[in-house]
């Protein structure tokens, strides 16, 4: 189980990303529209002055049960470890164990 402080930090990043999403998108569009390089640099400076954690690349997908940041399956929102346990216990409808 991930530490609670790490999970809270991730939630804080998600809020920041949502808050600055449209600002960042508008600045990116401006950069593509402006022909002069100096103007692009000025706009890029504005983009860089936004908080570091507002960038979507800083977000990490986590298991919603354990908070584990690795080996997550997007379809279920679970880590592979928990997914396997739930499939074995028949808690996920439609998911079956493979056998050959």
UniProtKB/Swiss-Prot annotation:
One of its GO terms (cellular component) is chloroplast. Keywords: Chloroplast, Plastid, Ribonucleoprotein, Ribosomal protein, RNA-binding, rRNA-binding. It is found in: Plastid, Chloroplast. One of its GO terms (biological process) is translation. Pfam families: Ribosomal_S14. It comes from the Eukaryota. Transmembrane segments: none annotated. GO terms for molecular function: rRNA binding; structural constituent of ribosome. Part of the 30S ribosomal subunit. Belongs to the universal ribosomal protein uS14 family. Binds 16S rRNA, required for the assembly of 30S particles. This is Small ribosomal subunit protein uS14c.
